[in-house]
Amino acid sequence: MRCPWCGHLEDRVVDSREAGDGQATRRRRECLGCTRRFTTYERIEEILPHVVKKDGRREPFDRKKIVEGVARACQKRPVSAEEIEALVSGVERQLQELGEREIRTVAIGEAVMQRLRRLDEVAYVRFASVYRAFRDVGEFMTELEGLGRKEPGSKPGGEGSR
């Protein structure tokens, strides 16, 4: 593995452990060139469906886009990076279980919102406001009123009530 500090190609593994509910292996490495340490994550290569955008374009599934969108919605909320990663991993598993070659962005967005609503209601509303592109305050208010009708398993006040 190439060292991110000096570019040297040889290293040794100092520590290795399971990460992300067994979905990845976290390895702590030490460069044999500069002796600095860095962390890598190894995960199974998964075959994910192609994403069909609203305009009909198709592109490969990009986990990073979902992580970034959820992280933006969770800014200044009591939601950890690990919780965000777990949420996105759950969405990926759900998509894989469908067994489809292609999936529409709508289905991905709905899967994210379903999990985000259980994790943190404020982050859910933030994500929904961008994802659903409300045309007016009335649509936004309808969504907020829907939060009053709790889903089974949702936490009162989201995670903000810790």
Curated annotation (Swiss-Prot):
Cofactor details (free text): Binds 1 zinc ion.
UniProt-listed PROSITE patterns: ATP_CONE
Cofactor names: Zn(2+)
InterPro entries tied to this protein: ATP-cone_dom, NrdR-like_N, RNR_NrdR-like
Zn finger intervals (unnamed): 3-34
Gene Ontology terms, MF aspect: ATP binding; DNA binding; zinc ion binding
Pfam families linked to this entry: ATP-cone, Zn_ribbon_NrdR
Boundaries of every ATP-cone domain copy: 49-139
NCBIfam families, per database record: transcriptional regulator NrdR
Family classification: Belongs to the NrdR family.
Protein name listed in UniProt: Transcriptional repressor NrdR
Organism: Anaeromyxobacter sp. (strain Fw109-5)
